[in-house]
Regions:
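Glycine-rich loops and low-complexity Gly/Arg-rich segments
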Residues: 25-29, 54-57, 92-96, 129-133
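Hydrophobic, well-ordered secondary-structure elements that form the walls
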Residues: 29, 70, 109
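Short, well-ordered loop/turn and helix-capping segments at boundaries between secondary-structure elements
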Residues: 11-15, 34-38, 76, 80-81, ...
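Cysteine-nucleophile active-site neighborhood
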Residues: 1-57, 61-66
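Acyltransferase
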Residues: 93-175
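A glycine-rich phosphate-binding loop feature that marks nucleotide/adenosyl-phosphate handling sites
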Residues: 2-9, 47-49, 73, 138-142, ...
Length: 175
């Protein structure tokens, strides 16, 4: 599960300030040992991470993953193992996600853009079902189409002027 899916896979969702709902506490699916508490502050940030060894993603251990977080709330992890080691230059070491032998949850949107992660997950799922895996499973899903589109948009826009209008330079990621 990613983001809200991660939260729902946990034991419980708590919303004492009624940020997301009028219900203060709701049972989760109980598939991951986490409890989510919603908060008024929203986390929005770009993330660079590495896949941690073990579990269903073990074949991708050490692979680089990039994506973003956008969520209200924090997961209190009560067991399992983390999925990703977050790379925070100059920051304290941190982890994201929770995994058990069969279930993985994370706040990291975009993690499936990593070919090694995608290949590891699909190969593991195939093995569990007795299906032969395909080495192309980790290939670029879009054949660079998004990169070509981004290049065309950048060529057609005055990014400096757009940056002045938004009061920050474009191309710079802020956490």
């Amino acid at each position: 599960g990613i983001c809200g899916g991660y939260q729902m896979l946990g034991e419980r969702l708590e919303d004492p300030d009624h940020v997301e709902s009028h219900v203060a506490t709701m049972a989760g699916l109980g598939l991951l040992p986490i409890v989510t508490t919603f908060a008024r502050d929203k986390t929005t940030r770009r993330v660079l991470a590495r896949v941690l060894p073990g579990g269903p993603l073990d074949a991708a251990a050490g692979a680089s993953v990039e994506g973003y977080e956008i969520h209200c709330g924090r997961a209190s992890v009560r067991g399992g193992a983390p999925v990703f080691a977050l790379e925070a230059p100059g920051g304290a070491p941190a982890v994201d996600g929770t995994r058990t032998a069969d279930v993985i949850g994370t706040y990291l949107h975009g993690c499936f853009s990593s070919g090694p992660l995608r290949r590891a997950l699909l190969t593991e799922a195939a093995a569990r079902r007795g299906v032969t895996s395909d080495p192309r499973w980790g290939a670029d899903l879009h054949g660079g189409r998004y990169d070509r589109l981004a290049d065309r948009v950048a060529a057609a826009l005055d990014l400096d002027a757009l940056g002045r209008l938004t009061c920050r330079p474009l191309g710079v990621v802020t956490a």
